[in-house]
Amino acid sequence: MGLNINRPRRGSLAFSPRKRAKRPVPRIRSWPEEDTVRLQAFPVYKAGMSHAFIKEDNPKSPNAGQEVFTPITILEAPPINVCAIRVYGRNERNYLTTLTEVWADNLDKELERKIKLPKKEDRKTVEDLEALKDKIEDVRVLVHTNPKLTCLPKKKPEILEIRIGGKDIEERLNYAKEILGKQLNITDVFQEGELVDTIGVTKGKGFQGQVKRWGVKIQFGKHARKGVGRHVGSIGPWQPKMVMWSVPMPGQMGYHQRTEYNKRILKIGNNGDEITPKGGFLHYGVIRNNYVVLKGSVQGPAKRLIVLRRAIRPQEPLIKVPEITYISTTSKQGK
């Protein structure tokens, strides 16, 4: 009986095909079910990272009650505008389909940079929703960001769809009517100590080879002497005369939409001077609006739009407000 060696394949096929995301604004396909009537997500901009000392409040941790060095990510959260209500129903195949949209009257003029707005005489009104109340299965709102309030070099807003949580359709509709045409802040959606999921597009790495893209083992010996060590030894058999889709090949790496679960909100503030490092964040600048401090890292480069979604599978409900003793604001310029 020979030696049994377990050597799993290099790289994961879970995210194939590894191609570029269609757009930098993430698309959310899953939403958590909850009883509270509120927005379930909020868009923010990634500013950069720093570190902090936080008192460990997990009683099961060996460091309970002690100050712990923690990497943090700072995200700028300018207010968002609720520009439309979108309601969904079921079609003959039992799929969710859009029934109608109700747009606000006081739309921001910057929104015309992004989409062609419907004419006022063609717009549906809030009264039209009452006739569809029996067919409505889901209630969501269209919101747009305000990058002009930040130090980002753009004015064109991003538009995304956010679901309103809750069990009762009528309560969700009333809440949507209440916030239509208004500005919402991060404090209207999340609170300190809450767990959120971060959804965004990762850093783009361009065209990369098999070793970096899939983690293929570098070949040594005669292969290295021939200068062909960084490749796959065999891409398939003689028969069938084809290359399987699962063979590691060079191609696009990065700029994929990814979701990271259960990031804890350590702090929500409105004074950017207390969190901005000396000289500003690299490739971003200074914080001018509300901000969110998350524990750990977040996908994507600086300036990338990240959507904070209410945790869809939280480990445990940690709603304690963390005790932060120190946040580093030293210069990130390397001086």
Swiss-Prot record:
UniProt keyword annotation of Cytoplasm present: no
Keywords recorded for this protein, A-Z: Ribonucleoprotein, Ribosomal protein, RNA-binding, rRNA-binding
InterPro entries found in the cross-reference section: L3_arc_euk, Ribosomal_L3_dom_3_arc_sf, Ribosomal_uL3, Ribosomal_uL3_arc, Ribosomal_uL3_CS, Transl_B-barrel_sf
BP term (GO), one: translation
Any single Gene Ontology cellular-component annotation: cytosolic large ribosomal subunit
Subunit structure: Part of the 50S ribosomal subunit. Forms a cluster with proteins L14 and L24e.
Similarity section: Belongs to the universal ribosomal protein uL3 family.
Protein known as: Large ribosomal subunit protein uL3
Native species: Methanocaldococcus jannaschii (strain ATCC 43067 / DSM 2661 / JAL-1 / JCM 10045 / NBRC 100440) (Methanococcus jannaschii)
Taxonomic lineage: Archaea, Methanobacteriati, Methanobacteriota, Methanomada group, Methanococci
